[in-house]
Amino acid sequence: SAKPPGLFVFMGDFTRVPFGPTKYDFASYTKSFDQLADLLDEYPSIREECRFVFIPGPGDPGNTSAYPRPGLPAALRGHKITACLQKVEFASNPCKIRWHSQDLVFFRDDLQARARRGCVLPPVDDLGTEEDDERLQLDMSPKERERRKAMREKPLFLHLAMTLVQQSHLSPLPLTQMPIYWERDQAMWLYPAPNAIFLGDRSETQCKMTDVCNVGTTMVNPGCFADDGSFAIYYPSEREVDLSVVSAAEM
């Protein structure tokens, strides 16, 4: 559309190679943000009107692996990106944003893989079979049938979404697997339930709607843009998600 989105959220890792003194130096890391600034400089309406949020990933530089993780320090951002963008935030991970009366949570972690390793029992699909749906088709809209079919095909992500929302916390794992700063534990809370949770996970792009205590929370995995060009667009007014992809030819 002619009007650009109001908010862009970038979740790390911001380099293909994990940051480290022997793999990726400070100068190369800063240069990547300078290159992004040069690209955005060609689109005045975007850099002047839109808000940008950068959330570090597990492979980005930081002083700890415990959550919540602080935002990228100024020394690693360079000066060009902050000079180019009028509205830019280098936020913590996770990050909570209040946007047009909606509560949005962004969390970058390969949580689905972690949960799979710690899963004692596999997710149980209690939705029945498609034959059961056929017997109930008079009481079920086509949209509801499609939703149940999608849930049946991908129960693991739904299982993770329900776990996070029901426990009202972003970590379903013991501290030995996912350490947390107790003094900052409130940053991991999901109470009251947010309108949407964006989980930056390297698994496939997915979107699920959970309904806990009659509070609908949309959980989205936008995918990994660096791997296959996938990303997600969220429309707050309709509470709809558009899972998109940029082809290799376009990139």
Residue ranges and their predicted role:
Residues 1-251:
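Extended recognition/assembly regions associated with phosphoester-bond processing machinery
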